[in-house]
Amino acid sequence: MPKKTTKIDTRVPKFIVFMGQFLYRISPFLAEKFARKLFITPIKHKIPKREFQMEAESIQTKLFVPSINKEIVVYAYGNSTKKILLVHGWSGRGTQLVKIADAVLKNGYSTISFDAPAHGKSGTKTTLMLEFIESILAVEKQYGPFEFAIGHSLGGMSILNAIKKGLQVKKAVVIGSGNSVVNIVNTFVEKIGLPHKVAVLMRNSFEKKYQFDMESFSAYVAAKDVTIPVLVFHDTDDEDIPVSEAHHLAENLSNKEVIITNNLGHRKILGDASVINRIVEFLLIKK
């Protein structure tokens, strides 16, 4: 039987692949520790020009989230009392959904978004989805109530989990959302060139430290407790999360609309005019 080859992501710096494989040869446990640190450390990007206006015009405040003992930066964009919550994904920032924000502002709404822990202007260097969820609930308590919630990637997963934990919104939109946490870990380990054994060790480490089943935070699990209308967007060319995950998520939502796009990938979809128009229609026009 031919040996299975690992699908290393060409976007991953070669030194990371080299270091991981070097450590694995010494000890799988060293490689797991290395991979786990990478997994919880987002990359901070400079704010692109298209987000300058939202960044400049938003009222920015710091919010302490007691449940995780961390401080985040919150962006209040627009003046309407009718508010929509926006949640960015991994290595994103509070202004990343600017095109969507501008569209809903034109329709009489304002937005509240935030830099998740270890993202944007928020402090610390590491985080995980649990902290995204707790941040959402803290933001709702301080800045809510919200009419709707829109999340991209990990932000979509976090919104569904937050709804399960009590976030009150009338409708939600998830764009390019992750689904199975175990699949995310497995894919991450594969992309950095390490054997599946490291993914198993990572899962064991997280579950031992935080005392929970990682898969219980999967979007499809949370979806079973979500009864509000949810619009699911996903692109067939999403290079980070396969479109099959969107279909699996949708199977577990009782009240959903699914739109599959093409040639937009994981991030370009956030600025696509037709996607934004459908979001506005779903949230603000469709009854």
Task: Label each region the model flagged.
Residues T6-F64:
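An N-terminal hydrophobic leader/cap segment in hydrolases
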Residues G94, A101-G123:
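Conserved alpha/beta-hydrolase
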Residues T126-E147:
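Alpha/beta-hydrolase active-site loop
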Residues I150-I159:
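Gly/Ala-rich beta-loop-alpha elbow adjacent to hydrolase catalytic centers
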Residues K164-F212:
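Hydrolase active-site cap/lid region
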Residues A219, I228, P242-L249:
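Short alpha-helix in the alpha/beta-hydrolase fold that links the catalytic acid
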Residues D225-T227, V232-H234, D238:
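Short beta-strand/loop motif that positions the catalytic acidic residue
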Residues L264-I276:
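Catalytic histidine-centered segment of alpha/beta-hydrolase-like enzymes
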